[in-house]
Curated annotation (Swiss-Prot):
Monomer. Binds 30S ribosomal subunits, but not 50S ribosomal subunits or 70S ribosomes. GO terms for molecular function: ribosomal small subunit binding. InterPro entries: KH_dom-like_a/b (IPR015946), RbfA (IPR000238), RbfA_dom_sf (IPR023799), Ribosome-bd_factorA_CS (IPR020053). One of its GO terms (cellular component) is cytosol. Belongs to the RbfA family. This is Ribosome-binding factor A. The keyword Cytoplasm applies.
Length: 135
């Protein structure tokens, strides 16, 4: 059996990442983390990426309605061990409970930048079919 050298995640990593994402979401929705900043913030978890050995879970989160994302990420990382402990009952099938790390998800910001570029007058002019006929 040969090992793949590509950096694409395996099906198992994707499946476990989705299970961890769902479990973290439930912990946060139930308000089990006693932190005023986390309790008053709506947190969207867009993705959880697992390390190849499934021992590290990196959760990409977007705090909604809060200007200071770094403070929310810091609070989540401060409570990461507690959250990891609360994952146990929902992830019984795992041999090891993964260490959870929280990171700010910048994909939505990237989407907004691309959308703004596509709507810019320069790009709109290039995409307009009427301007091709005039030349």
């Amino acid at each position: 059996m040969t090992r793949s050298t590509s950096s694409a995640p395996s099906q198992r990593m994707l499946r476990v990442g989705e299970q961890v994402r769902a479990a973290i979401t439930q912990v946060l929705q139930r308000g089990e983390v006693r932190d005023p900043l986390i309790e008053k913030t709506v947190i969207s978890i867009s993705e959880v990426r697992m390390s190849p050995d499934l021992k590290i879970a990196t959760a990409y989160v977007t705090p909604l309605g809060v200007a200071d994302h770094a403070a929310v990420i810091e609070a989540l990382n401060k409570h990461a061990k507690f959250i990891r402990g609360r994952l146990g009952p929902q992830l019984r099938q795992m041999k090891y409970m993964p260490d959870v790390r929280f990171r700010d998800d910048t994909s939505f910001d990237n989407y907004q930048k691309i959308d703004a570029l596509l709507r810019s007058p320069e790009v709109s002019r290039d995409l307009d079919p009427d301007t091709d006929d005039q030349e």
